[in-house]
Amino acid sequence: MLKILSTQLTGVFQRISTQEEEQFEDAARLLAQAVISNGTIFIYGIDEMEAVAAEALYGAEKLPNVKRLDINEVKTADRVLIVSRFCTNEEAIRIAKQLQEQNIWTIGMSSIIEETTQTLVDYVDVHIDLCLKQPLVPAEDGTRIGFPSAVAALFAYHSLALMTQEIVAEYE
């Protein structure tokens, strides 16, 4: 079962890397703009995606000027990263709408599932699909288990952080 999980997770990482390459570049540019202009990068992780906020705030290779989102502190030079399991998360959509009304550049990170009337994708400037729609490992009873959404989000975050650091280094 461990080998299946490892293989499936590698596939998720590959899909994120190839399908979302343009979105990573756009999102990294937005974050680099905040770093270069002494703005703040605000992070908001919903439920298990709080792992991304923890990594951004306390990880070994933090981006500069990162804070947990306080919507009342956000200014136009700042950028916001909202991370949720699925693009249909109501809390993520509500926050993204507020930020859009304030003309704040916002990046969303979530798995895109069946389109409904509104999704996070509709209210952010750049969206990175986490490409994880169902559990990865088939169980003996025909169901599936193993839904590592936070692992996919951490991979996407680290990819984004590396690209952002590269852009900032080129600027300096």
What does each model-found stretch correspond to?
Residues G39-T40, I46-Q165:
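Glycine-rich phosphate-binding loops that contact phosphosugars or nucleotide phosphates
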Residues T10-F13, L136, Q165-E172:
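Internal, active-site/partner-interface "lid" segment
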Residues M1, Q23-D26, E48, A152:
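Short, contiguous, pocket-lining structural segments
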Residues T18-E22, P148-V151:
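Short, surface-exposed alpha-helical recognition segments that flank or form part
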Residues L5-T7, E21-F24, N72-V74, N89:
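Long, low-complexity, intrinsically disordered N-terminal extensions of eukaryotic proteins, enriched
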Residues Q19-I36:
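A short, well-structured juxtamembrane/interface segment
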Residues S17-E21, V83-F86:
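Short, flexible loop segments at the rims of nucleotide/cofactor-binding pockets, characterized by
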Residues M1-T18:
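Generic N-terminal amphipathic, Lys/Arg-enriched alpha-helix
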